[in-house]
From Swiss-Prot:
Keyword Iron-sulfur listed: yes
Disulfide linkage: none
Organism listed in the record: Polynucleobacter necessarius subsp. necessarius (strain STIR1)
Reactions the enzyme catalyzes: (2R,3S)-3-isopropylmalate = (2S)-2-isopropylmalate
Subunit structure: Heterodimer of LeuC and LeuD.
Alphabetical keyword list: 4Fe-4S, Amino-acid biosynthesis, Branched-chain amino acid biosynthesis, Iron, Iron-sulfur, Leucine biosynthesis, Lyase, Metal-binding
Protein name: 3-isopropylmalate dehydratase large subunit
Gene Ontology terms: biological process: L-leucine biosynthetic process
Organism superkingdom: Bacteria
Cofactor note as given: Binds 1 [4Fe-4S] cluster per subunit.
Cofactor dependence: [4Fe-4S] cluster
Pathway: Amino-acid biosynthesis; L-leucine biosynthesis; L-leucine from 3-methyl-2-oxobutanoate: step 2/4
Major enzyme class: lyase
Gene behind this protein: leuC
Length: 469
């Protein structure tokens, strides 16, 4: 019987199934951070339970850590408590953790793949919705709640029901200037933020195969914004090349054995999907969100939509509210929207390829950050990414142009640390969510690629990076 890639991963991890479809599945890897783990560890302590498989866990603090000078530690008492609590829990249970001053510290969805802790064929969970990122490696990866974090710590299993299968096929080749971020924003714009609800998405097609692992991680990272439980990209030589030699990757004979299995991790040619979505890569222009949901997205050449032209009353109402919050008028050219701040970072776009792309645009433009831009931040996804960028001299390009070059962390993706927007400020952001208040109370977020964010910082407004030669 022909199976999809998701079917294969599911079947390989089911321990027991109930008649109603609820299954007990085995979890190969759990990633932990400081926000969703304290209650889970407290539950273990209260019940007197040990961690079932210590080596299956890897922890890091990322949401609350400062991205400026860390010599004085964390000043916010709540943030400090969460980080200190993770340190104490990992020490007590013997779990490997990259603490704040460890060079390997960074955003959980950056450091997992970077260390080779995310491998093809695994089930990977984390108390974080963007765990779907790890599907780029052919792993079944999804976010879980705090009670489930405790359950995995205690049993290395979860109870869940199988998703339906969706294929998102992107054939053709991207235009220069369009990126994986633009692909996934275009997909969300096409199917909506509920389009993937109940599904695991497999991304396939020529354009997907041509993406680097960094690009694939960006793609899978935002599948959750389409409502999907998880997302996958089939394993190929690009996947294998990225993994080889990393600390957690198999070595020697174990690697040869793993390769035999990994090369089976794809959908069968005649596998049936419950839904199929198709896009042409060459038709995908650089994307910019205009509203307060990732599905409110348009090409850089478009204009802000007019709610009066929307027939659906619910959608029209949502558009009107979004325009009011974003302080935008219908029919405004996207390219004329000025920004106050620029954020290049997050688990979506803070890897070395992202930083190179942004630096390349800045270098080509040869100018400094525009006078109307109050702050332009570059926050590498990990200490190792930061070190690599500095070896390549990328930090000097940013600093010479007037950007701030920061320490790794989640930073301005969410208003959980010192990096945030003030009310009314507008930000070009490479993150994944543009909800009301996401980057700070009253802050206005436009999601874009690293190249688009860099160009907006220099020009002071959104521009089409395809025109930058």
């Amino acid at each position: 019987m022909s199976r999809t890639f998701y079917d294969k991963l599911w079947d390989d991890h089911v321990i027991y199934s109930e008649e109603d479809g609820t299954a007990t599945i085995y979890i190969d890897r759990q990633l932990l951070h400081e926000v969703t783990s304290p209650q889970a560890f407290e539950g273990l302590n209260l019940a007197g339970r040990p961690v079932w498989r210590i080596s299956a866990n890897l922890a890091v603090s990322d949401h609350n850590v400062p991205t400026t000078d860390r010599s004085e530690g964390i000043t916010d008492p709540i943030s400090k408590l969460q980080v200190d609590t993770l340190d104490q829990n990992c020490d007590a249970f013997g779990i490997t953790q990259y603490k704040m001053n460890d060079t390997r510290q960074g955003i959980v969805h950056v450091i997992g793949p970077e260390q080779g802790a995310t491998l093809p064929g695994m089930t990977v969970v984390c108390g974080d919705s963007h765990t779907s990122t790890h599907g780029a490696f052919g792993a079944l990866a999804f976010g879980i709640g705090t009670s489930e974090v405790e359950h995995v710590l205690a049993t290395q299993t979860l109870l869940m029901k199988k998703s339906k299968n969706m294929l998102v096929k992107v054939d053709g080749r991207l235009q220069p200037g369009s990126t994986a971020k633009d692909i996934v924003l275009a997909v969300i714009g096409k199917i909506g933020t509920a389009g993937g609800t109940g599904y695991t998405i497999e991304f396939a097609g020529e354009a997907i195969r041509n993406l680097s692992m960094e690009g694939r991680m960006t793609l899978c990272n935002m599948a959750i914004e389409a409502g999907a439980r998880a997302s996958l990209v089939a394993v190929d030589e690009t996947t294998i090349e990225y993994i080889q030699g990393r600390p957690y990757a198999p070595k020697g004979a174990a690697m040869l054995q793993a390769l035999q299995y990994w090369r089976t991790l794809h959908s069968d040619p005649d596998a049936k999907f419950d839904a199929v979505v198709e896009l042409r890569a060459e038709e995908i222009a650089p994307q910019v969100t205009w509203g307060t949901s990732p599905e409110m997205v348009l090409a850089i050449s478009d204009r802000v939509p007019d709610p009066e032209k929307e027939r659906d009353s619910n959608k029209r109402s949502a558009m009107e509210r979004a325009l009011q919050y974003m302080n935008l008028n219908p029919n405004t050219p996207i390219s004329s929207i000025a920004v106050d701040k620029v954020f290049i970072g997050s688990c979506t776009n803070s890897r070395i390829e992202d930083i190179r792309a942004a630096a390349k645009v800045i270098d080509r433009l040869g100018k400094k950050v525009a006078a109307n831009v109050k702050l332009a931040l570059v926050v590498p996804g990990s200490g190792l990414v930061k070190a690599q960028a500095e070896r390549e001299g990328l930090d000097r390009i940013f600093k010479a142009a007037g950007f701030e070059w920061r320490e790794p962390g989640c930073s301005m993706c969410l208003a959980m640390n010192a990096d945030r927007l003030e009310p009314g400020e507008r930000c070009a952001s490479t993150s994944n969510r543009n909800f009301e208040g996401r980057q700070g109370n009253g802050g206005r977020t436009h999601l874009v690629s690293p190249a688009m964010a860099a160009a907006a910082a220099i020009e002071g407004h959104f521009v089409d990076v395809r025109k930058i030669s």
